[in-house]
Regions:
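Hydrophobic, membrane-inserted alpha-helices
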Residues: 42-44, 104-110, 165-173, 191-198, ...
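Generic alpha-helical transmembrane segments
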Residues: 65-76, 128-139, 161-171, 185-199
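Membrane-helix interface and helix-disruption motif detector
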Residues: 45-67, 111-130, 170-191, 203-208, ...
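Cytoplasmic membrane-interface regions of multi-pass membrane proteins
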Residues: 75-96, 138-158, 198-214, 248-257
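N-terminal topogenic module of multi-pass integral membrane proteins
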Residues: 1-128
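Transmembrane alpha-helical segments of multi-pass membrane proteins
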Residues: 91-107, 129-134, 154-169, 216-222
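C-terminal transmembrane-bundle signature of multipass membrane proteins
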Residues: 187-265
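Membrane-helix boundary elements
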Residues: 39-50, 140-179
Length: 265
C-alpha cells in the first residue's frame, strides 16, 4: 500500500491523517466490511433474474436501478440492526446454524431477484449460489486468529474443508447443469483454494487465501455483468484499508498472506 510506504507510522503525516480518519469511526461501527459479502449475495440474486431474461447479458450499466440502490442501503442497515449471528469470525456449530445461514442468504438473493418476478426457475437457479455462499461462510467460520497464543489443529478443521470443497463442486456442477456460466465458473475457480488447505501441509496462509477469494472471486465476476458494482466495491475497499491503517496501524482488508505460522497436524 502506497500510504504505508510514503506515510509510515510515527511520522507527522501519519498522525495528522490518523486524526482525519477517526472522523469515519461512526461509519465503521456499521461494520462496512460485511457489506462486501452482503452486496455480493444481493447482486448475485439480481444476476439470476438478468440471466434468465438474457443468457448473454454482459457489462450492462443500465442494470443499476432505484430498487437495487434501495436494497444496497437497506440490507446492510438491517443486518447491522439485527446484529446477525452469521459473523464471519464466529463458529457455525449446529445444523440449525447452517439452516439459518442458508435461509439468510436465500432471502437476500431473492430480494435481489425481485420478489415480484420470482418463479420456480429462479429458485432452481438460486440453489448453486446459496451452496457456494454457504461454503464461503464455513470457510470464514474457521478461527485463524492466533494472537492470543491459542493453537488449533488441522484435524479440527479438515471436516469443514471437505464440506467446503464438496459444496463448491456441487455448486459448479449445478451451475453447469443450469447453463449458468457465472456460478459454475466462480465455484470452479474457487475450489483449488480450500483444496490446497485440505491436501497440502497445513499453513495459515492457505486458509487466508480461502477466506479472501470466497468473496473476491464472485464479486469480480459479477462486476463483469454489473460494471457499476465494481465502482461500489473499490472505494469501500480503499477507504477501509486506509481507515484501518491510520487508526490501528494494520492494513486490512488485504490479499497479502504473510503469516508464517504453520497449523499443527
Amino acid at each position: 500500500m502506497l500510504a504505508e510506504k510514503y506515510i509510515p507510522k510515527g511520522t507527522n503525516g501519519y498522525k495528522n491523517l490518523s486524526g482525519f480518519f477517526k472522523n469515519f469511526d461512526r461509519i465503521f461501527t456499521l461494520k462496512p466490511l460485511r457489506w462486501f459479502p452482503l452486496w455480493t449475495v444481493l447482486v448475485a440474486g439480481n444476476n439470476i433474474s438478468e440471466h434468465l431474461n438474457d443468457r448473454w447479458f454482459y457489462w450492462n450499466w443500465s442494470s443499476f436501478n432505484l430498487y437495487l440502490l434501495f436494497l444496497l442501503v437497506l440490507i446492510p442497515y438491517v443486518d447491522n440492526r439485527l446484529k446477525s449471528r452469521f459473523d464471519f469470525a464466529s463458529q457455525l456449530s449446529s445444523i440449525t446454524d447452517y439452516l439459518k445461514c442458508v435461509v439468510y442468504a436465500s432471502i437476500i438473493m431473492l430480494l435481489g431477484s425481485n420478489p415480484l418476478s420470482i418463479s420456480l426457475t429462479t429458485l432452481i437457479y438460486s440453489v448453486p449460489y446459496v451452496l457456494f455462499f454457504l461454503a464461503g461462510v464455513l470457510t470464514w467460520s474457521i478461527n485463524i486468529d492466533q494472537e492470543n497464543g491459542e493453537k488449533f489443529y488441522k484435524k479440527d478443521i479438515y471436516k469443514l474443508l471437505i464440506i467446503v470443497v464438496a459444496l463448491s463442486l456441487l455448486a459448479s456442477f449445478l451451475g453447469f447443469s443450469n447453463d449458468d456460466p457465472m456460478i459454475s465458473t466462480v465455484a470452479a475457480i474457487y475450489i483449488p483454494f480450500p483444496l490446497v488447505a485440505l491436501v497440502f501441509p497445513a499453513a495459515i496462509r492457505h486458509l487466508q487465501r480461502s477466506r479472501s477469494y470466497a468473496v473476491f472471486i464472485p464479486a469480480m465476476f459479477l462486476s463483469m455483468r454489473f460494471p457499476w458494482f465494481f465502482f461500489l466495491l473499490v472505494p469501500l475497499f480503499v477507504l477501509s484499508r486506509h481507515y484501518f491503517y491510520f487508526t490501528s496501524g494494520k492494513i486490512y482488508p488485504t490479499f497479502k498472506v504473510d503469516t508464517p505460522e504453520e497449523v499443527s497436524s
